Amino acid sequence: NVSSQYISALLMIAPILSNGLTLTLTGEIISRPYINLTLQLMNDFGARAKWLNEYQLKVEPQPYQSIPFYVESDWSAASYWYQIAALSNKAEIILPGLFETSYQGDSKVAEIFQLLGIESIYGNKMVTLKKTDKIAERLDYDFINQPDLAQTFVVTCALMNIPFRFSGLQSLKIKETDRITALIKEMGKLGYILHEIDDRI
């Protein structure tokens, strides 16, 4: 319940282990979509990896295979373009390399930003962002599966004067820095007061 990165690391080395690997997870599983992304890409490259049940994963001893592969753009990075669109009076932004049906859990950003007035129009390996006037009066969301998006939405909602309550943020404290503390400190410089309660802001 600390970070899915440790799980992904073990999964990715498992195909080259002589007996493969079976992982049994305990406690609350955070960032599950990131684990699913790891499994999907492993299978794309010839591994045999899957969930056995809600808490157990199994990887067979089978080496990876080299295949042609199109690397999708990063939905986490795309969140900042969504933010720019949301904070603009008018916006039409084209982001290449993003798919409507994506392995990435952070592709959820399109659905959440729709609540903040940003429409996502999908084309051939691209998405176009357009500003609309359909904006929620308040935003409540559990980021347990997309923690890396939380900072973008905290800043966006604050600058748009939209009240919010976000939960599922416990993993943000053990990133490259304590992102919660940094967020509270930096937003305070702009005059915003954020309240941290357990895993919520």
Model-derived regions: residue spans:
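Short, structured segments at the rim of ligand-binding sites
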Residues: N1-I201
